[in-house]
Swiss-Prot record:
Residues 96-179, 357-389 are annotated as: Disordered. Pfam families: E2F_CC-MB, E2F_TDP. It is found in: Nucleus. InterPro entries: E2F, E2F-DP_heterodim, E2F_CC-MB, E2F_WHTH_DNA-bd_dom, WH-like_DNA-bd_sf, WH_DNA-bd_sf. One of its GO terms (biological process) is G1/S transition of mitotic cell cycle. Residues 204-225 are annotated as: Leucine-zipper. Keywords: Activator, Cell cycle, DNA-binding, Nucleus, Transcription, Transcription regulation. Component of the DRTF1/E2F transcription factor complex. Binds cooperatively with TFDP1/Dp-1 to E2F sites. Interacts with retinoblastoma protein RB1 and related proteins (such as RBL1) that inhibit the E2F transactivation domain. Binds EAPP. Transcription activator that binds DNA cooperatively with DP proteins through the E2 recognition site, 5'-TTTC[CG]CGC-3' found in the promoter region of a number of genes whose products are involved in cell cycle regulation or in DNA replication. The DRTF1/E2F complex functions in the control of cell-cycle progression from G1 to S phase. E2F3 binds specifically to RB1 in a cell-cycle dependent manner. Inhibits adipogenesis, probably through the repression of CEBPA binding to its target gene promoters. Residues 358-369, 380-389 have a biased composition (Polar residues). This is Transcription factor E2F3.
């Protein structure tokens, strides 16, 4: 204790639970009192016995006048821990068991030991620090360390003060949930207000009143929408919608759903077409690689003319190497075809219609000698009147090509027998014009004209003249 400073008098008040008990008032010098006098005093023991009820405790408020701590077990099994307390003069000293622990107890206070503030700046051991609080637990529980119902709560706020034994109270219907106050729901309501405006302009003050929210929450929505260019600030506290039409929201949704359904159907149809293309490609590959099919890999004139879709139409067959480019300009008056190839020559064939079942050749009767008589056509007779006649043998002529031979054909396609006669290029000659043979009574002189040799002039006459 500092010199020149009188020791501070300390006054203690012990109150039992329920307002009943005994009061012990002790006034003494802190330096000259016994260290364990208060706990062993009869008045303190009587107060402790009166406060020994379930959930009762005694709290002692002292100044840090001593650095030595002691504890004494009371009749109820409670623990007192704290600095040494001064006691009344003449108090008996009793030895008690010492135990240092952090006390636990119920929230209701049954006993209170208060100390008035010190009269001086400090005590004998002095530091002048804040008063220390110690609580004495006087419950009936035999365990003097921990209580399951009074563990340190892990929650925050109001949940920490609630006892775990008490059931959770259900929320009242009037209490709003977290979703009701969320910014997402508030944004939907704000968009609905914008859609109800005829020109898309909304007053923020009116929106805050209708939605019953603070204006700063409205600003949270408008800042985001303005950042993504969906609204713009028209004037003070007025914003205008810049997105798509909100009045046709239902129609746009139906249109989007219809487009999605159409895209799904087109995707399925495209998938079927891909499968068909793969199947046809595989079949074509098998047909082309087969040796038996390669021998018959051609198209005939009759095959083309048998197609019903090509009836009464002009058919042009094009035989071209791979990578040949075919262009057909879009012309209404005339039809043009442009062919271009860098791999080889291009062959084009015209497939006319056959008017007769047989080859288009004229039929003429032959005589008994096998000669073809002169045709009855006046045009041919007039045009060929200056030519000499001759007889034509059937066996010396080769067959002419028919329209079926316009396409390149294999040997098995060429007809072996021609039912119709051939076309005569010139009118046949009569037998009188040429002697094909001599009779038995004729000689070589009969091949020449007969002349009278006596009438011939002499050679001398030719020389003189």
């Amino acid at each position: 204790m500092r010199k020149g400073i009188q020791p501070a008098l300390e006054q203690y008040l012990v109150t039992a639970g329920g307002g009943e008990g005994a009061a012990v008032v002790a006034a003494a010098a802190a330096a000259s009192m016994d260290k364990r006098a208060l706990l062993a005093s009869p008045g303190f023991a009587a107060a402790a016995a009166a406060a020994a009820a379930p959930g009762a405790y005694i709290q002692i408020l002292t100044t840090n006048t001593s650095t030595t701590s002691c504890s004494s077990s009371l009749q109820s099994g409670a623990v007192a821990a704290g600095p040494l307390l001064p006691s009344a003069p003449g108090a008996e000293q009793t030895a008690g068991s010492l135990l240092y622990t952090t006390p636990h107890g119920p929230s209701s206070r049954a006993g209170l030991l208060q100390q008035p503030p010190a009269l001086g700046r400090g005590g004998s051991g002095g530091g002048g620090g804040p008063p220390a609080k110690r609580r004495l637990e006087l419950g009936e529980s035999g365990h003097q360390y921990l209580s399951d119902g009074l563990k340190t709560p892990k929650g925050k706020g109001r949940a920490a003060l609630r006892s775990p034994d008490s059931p959770k109270t259900p929320k009242s219907p009037s209490e709003k949930t977290r979703y009701d106050t969320s910014l997402g729901l508030l944004t939907k309501k704000f968009i609905q207000l914008l859609s109800q405006s005829p020109d898309g302009v909304l007053d923020l003050n009116k929106a805050a009143e209708v939605l019953k929210v603070q204006k700063r929450r409205i600003y949270d929505i408008t800042n985001v929408l303005e950042g993504i260019h969906l609204i713009k600030k028209k004037s003070k506290n007025n914003v205008q919608w810049m997105g798509c039409s909100l009045s046709e929201d239902g129609g746009m949704l139906a249109q989007c759903q219809g487009l999605s359904k159409e895209v799904t159907e087109l995707s399925q149809e495209e998938k079927k077409l891909d499968e068909l293309i793969q199947s046809c490609t595989l079949d074509l590959k098998l047909l082309t690689e087969d040796s038996e099919n390669q021998r018959l890999a051609y198209v005939t004139y009759q095959d083309i003319r048998k197609i019903s879709g090509l009836k009464d139409q002009t058919v042009i067959v094009v035989k071209a190497p791979p990578e040949t480019r075919l262009e057909v300009p879009d012309s209404i008056e005339s039809l043009q075809i442009h062919l271009a190839s860098t791999q080889g020559p291009i062959e084009v064939y015209l497939c006319p219609e056959e008017t007769e079942t047989h080859s288009p050749m004229k039929t003429n009767n032959q005589d008994h000698n096998g000669n073809i008589p002169k045709p009855a056509s006046k045009d041919l007779a007039s045009t060929n009147s200056g030519h000499s006649d001759c007889s034509v043998s059937m066996g010396n002529l080769s067959p002419l090509a028919s329209p079926a031979n316009l396409l390149q054909q294999t040997e098995d396609q060429i007809p072996s027998n021609l039912e119709g006669p051939f076309v005569n290029l010139l009118p046949p000659l009569l037998q009188e014009d040429y002697l094909l043979s001599l009779g038995e009574e004729e000689g070589i002189s009969d091949l020449f004209d007969a002349y009278d040799l006596e009438k011939l002039p002499l050679v001398e006459d030719f020389m003189c003249s």
